[in-house]
Amino acid sequence: MKSSRTVTLYFVLIVICSSEATWSRPAEPIVHPLILQEHELAGEELLRPKRAVAVGGPVAEEYTVDVEISFENVSFLESIRAHLNSLRFPVQGNGTDILSMAMTTVCTPTGNDLLCFCEKGYQWPEERCLSSLTCQEHDSALPGRYCNCLKGLPPQGPFCQLPETYITLKIKVRLNIGFQEDLENTSSALYRSYKTDLERAFRAGYRTLPGFRSVTVTQFTKGSVVVDYIVEVASAPLPGSIHKANEQVIQNLNQTYKMDYNSFQGTPSNETKFTVTPEFIFEGDNVTLECESEFVSSNTSWFYGEKRSDIQNSDKFSIHTSIINNISLVTRLTIFNFTQHDAGLYGCNVTLDIFEYGTVRKLDVTPIRILAKEERKVVCDNNPISLNCCSENIANWSRIEWKQEGKINIEGTPETDLESSCSTYTLKADGTQCPSGSSGTTVIYTCEFVSVYGAKGSKNIAVTFTSVANLTITPDPISVSEGQSFSITCLSDVSSFDEVYWNTSAGIKIHPRFYTMRRYRDGAESVLTVKTSTREWNGTYHCIFRYKNSYSIATKDVTVHPLPLESDIMMDPLEASGLCTSSHQFKCCIEENDGEEYIVTFHVDSSSFPAEREVIGKQACYTYSLPGKLPSRCPKDIDVFCHFTNAANSSVRSPSMKLTLVPGKNITCQDPIIGIGEPGKVIQKLCQFAGVSRSPGQTIGGTVTYKCVGSQWKEETRACISAPINGLLQLAKALIKSPSQDQKLPKYLRDLSVSTGKEEQDIRSSPGSLGAIISILDLLSTVPTQVNSEMMRDILATINVILDKSTLNSWEKLLQQQSNQSSQFLQSVERFSKALELGDSTPPFLFHPNVQMKSMVIKRGHAQMYQQKFVFTDSDLWGDVAIDECQLGSLQPDSSIVTVAFPTLKAILAQDGQRKTPSNSLVMTTTVSHNIVKPFRISMTFKNNHRSGGKPQCVFWNFSLANNTGGWDSSGCTVEDDGRDNRDRVFCKCNHLTSFSILMSPDSPDPGSLLKILLDIISYIGLGFSIVSLAACLVVEAMVWKSVTKNRTSYMRHICIVNIALCLLIADIWFIVAGAIHDGHYPLNETACVAATFFIHFFYLSVFFWMLTLGLMLFYRLIFILHDASKSTQKAIAFSLGYGCPLIISSITVGVTQPQEVYMRKNACWLNWEDTRALLAFAIPALIIVVVNVSITVVVITKILRPSVGDKPGKQEKSSLFQISKSIGVLTPLLGLTWGFGLATVIQGSNAVFHIIFTLLNAFQGLFILLFGCLWDQKVQEALLHKFSLSRWSSQHSKSTSLGSSTPVFSMSSPISRRFNNLFGKTGTYNVSTPETTSSSVENSSSAYSLLN
């Protein structure tokens, strides 16, 4: 037994050996412990074969043998380690070779414990770490992964083992020998030989690495010979160990391989772990990057960006590197206050010998987004209000803080939930904390989010504290009488509010049209104004200022004393004749009002007399009898009126009653009710007092007109209004003055439809009742409120009654008395249609025998066209209306389109006073609830009831015609062919002509006519030729410019030609733009149309003025020969005249007329003619220039034909001058002819020939410019021939010119030229258009369309 003082040290060797012996027995221990007894290792398998024994013969086998050595002297350990390191492997023996030996486990006594450590690269198996006692205080392994120290040897083994995971080192090395193809064949002898020799050398060199397992050659590649191999080790090599191993490899390798030591190159796998904290980086965070590597090295670095810039310790960066237990390395980079500028690529490098390990990570910054309402308004009324701040970012917030800054200090209570990243700050401000009358004291509250890593994000909330408004209302008591006006002023000392409104004591809101609101810097004011008070205004009124949920209210009592309105006083007689000696009774009656008594006096001339009161049914009548006496003169006219005074001492007087006192000589007509009169006398009496039959106590309205014929009063006209309808008329007059008209209107419309149905018989016979209903509809349509479907149903029920065929006789009599009633009725219907609010409900189809209504609501993204059809079987009429999607797209969302059709209105509407042309179709009115972009194109189809005779016309109702009584107007509406059989139908559409003939013609041909089609074809074809020709002209001029501008005359001539072509080209393009704007596909954009009109005007004028410049320049060169102005002077004058004058004229025209919106036509983009004669700003300069050019041409031609001695310019100059005269002679007459034909088209009804000639000359003028202004120039011809190197043609041309035996192909005397001259009358052809349009729209027009025959 060993002594306790004996210090024993154990260590275990792993010996890997190879043997060629044949084994016929199981493996047994071949090395036993030197001190431990054999029975202590019973059952422990120390011999582990690497390969199974092959049956049948000797095979080289590899075995791993665990050898346990114990000794008492600790110093022996280092000696044995040194000895093992000095061995050169393989160690050859008799039949067995030792391939490698490694120390795995060392046990040393410490105190009373035996501590067993694993050598580097080895570890205790995991199960031993769990079941045995570990010595944690001495354990250098990373916690939680494995252990490398146990207390005592495990009794049943095993010893320390290589870890199951290992590190693969990929290495390349170069052999400085020639590469042979067999090295690519793994089965070749050369490949096997190289592989065996190299692996033996590699194994011998790398076995010294801790935890070495194996080495394998993987391939040979070219580049001399490059050897790729992998080394597997259990743990990372120590610094310098790879270099040392490489030296051993070269020492152990046969020198014939010529291995290059400097060619060792490591290719590591990713052995670096990279972590970023925090995972999501916010601006302001302190960010930590950590690289962890199992390779321990002192050579570590960090870099930034694509250029891999080195990072050093600074105020911004901090680098810290540590080695853990000598087996792993951790390097940390801390970036302080990370910003958007710091974002990018970051990487770490760990260099170990020939290996470089590292990784790269891109860092992005996430902005902190705080959600909060940036502005809040708080009323200091002690009600709590919450400010909310939330972060969109999911972050590890450490705290959320609230701060405030402002003139007043109002603190709140914070409530924070870090999990939801939200915080609430509750404020509760009372009146003592806010300055009185404060209308906007702002305090900035800031919520700040702070993350664990240092990032901060904040949001400012501007809170405006407003004190509760103190209202001051008109202090004086308000006491008025009916018919008088009053106003109530309500003042607030605070200017901040959300809403101001007035209501009655019953809570009924007053319509905003009755009050105004004004906001001041330190307060606000609202004034309720009633211009005509009624008894309904009697009561208490509340002025209410609302701010958020706080209400400030001021009240005022209003007393309205009853007093009849002047229009409510019924008088008898209105006018009468009486005998000078007889007494006469005057009567004034009003509706009885709950016993209200008035002081009533009658005023006769300058005297007043008290009246007697008598109640008759529902009327209170006041009478006075004028006693009979012989006046100072007879006959005599007397004016009498009654005067009502109420309890408030307010008064009203009636209209005057006229009494004519006569001596009685010629009196032939006498009646106790009507009175007396001489033959031919006409008087009016109220139906109420004319003996018209009525129920007792009822009040009827209207008047009866009588005429004395012979000895009898004959009733001329009767316009009486039945009592029920008269009552409704009086209610309608009161309703439009009522404070609650919105609330009363639906019930009133319902009562009106019921009463109209009951009074249908009276309406048929009484134009007065019919006129009263029209007046009622007119009054009610002015109420500013929305109309719903039920209200519209009641309105159409009323309309159905008054438009019945049986009422046509009443309509005829009514229109004889009041010709504007039909127009007034139609206007009322359109106002109701525009006020119809359909909302989300299904648009109703309202059907009656005499009126139908259909509608549609335009929703956002609406793609369906509006198309409605109306059929009236009883009237044998039908029609439909359509609006395309393009037009609907210009409407506001939720707009309502309403169409109302009437079969009988055609016979009722007033007819054209000149033509007396009736409408023989439906009348359809289409309205849109919101404003529309004009023109708004609409298509309609009507049934044609007059197939055999008459020409149909599409017309609309123009309210402004005939002194605003209205009439049919055909402006802007045309009959078109819709491609179907049109014998029984007429297709109408608003359209605008685009052919050139309309530029000056107010009486343009009808669309669809043969003339219109022909003019359009000529216009489009001509414009195409013109634009192409003008462009070609400019190209030709650019090509030959240097050749044809060698003298001043030619230079200036071509300057003029180029500018004429350029101006005409731009004018034609603008003309196309103008046509596109108004040609049926796009809404007329006013701004674009003004621009198009201006530029057409300007550039067409420029064409004329450049022609004038050309003429003046020719005149100057021929007449003032001795005077020679410089080229720059001529150019300055030319450009000033060519562009300056047109600019001045066109600018003045638009500046004077556009502010009054009379610059251009209503429905076309050209100068106005009807309103301002703006077209003269184009016509007058053009005519003057034509006359001047013609005069110059005559002078020039005369001068050329009869030259004088001494005046003859040089040969080249004369050639140029002759060309100029030729051009002027060709171009100017054509301009004159064009303008002459244009003037001819102005005359209404002008012959179609003028339209055709004008369009033809105007459209093709660009072609004429190219031919006669450019190509006829002999110098241009020569320059073009020379330009294209046509040597034969050019030489012949030159020769013939010099010898005079032939002429140029395009010269004036050539055969071709002569034919040209004969064709065009020896002149060129050039034309400039003078645009104008024909159609004019009427501003005050109806949406009602119909058909005239």
Swiss-Prot record:
The keyword Phosphoprotein applies. It is a multi-pass membrane protein. It is found in: Cell membrane. Residues 1-24 form the signal peptide. GO terms for cellular component: apical part of cell; cell surface; cytoplasmic vesicle; plasma membrane. Residues 954-1006 are annotated as: GPS. Residues 1037-1055, 1121-1131, 1197-1216, 1272-1349 are cytoplasmic. The keyword rRNA-binding does not apply. Disulfide bonds join 291-348, 389-447, 490-543, 954-988, 973-990. The modification Phosphoserine is found at residues 819, 1310. Belongs to the G-protein coupled receptor 2 family. Adhesion G-protein coupled receptor (ADGR) subfamily. Homodimer; disulfide-linked. Heterodimer of 2 chains generated by proteolytic processing; the large extracellular N-terminal fragment and the membrane-bound C-terminal fragment predominantly remain associated and non-covalently linked. Fragment generates by the processing enzyme furin remains attached to the extracellular N-terminal fragment. Interacts (via N-terminal extracellular domain) with SFTPD. This is Adhesion G protein-coupled receptor F5. It comes from Rattus norvegicus.
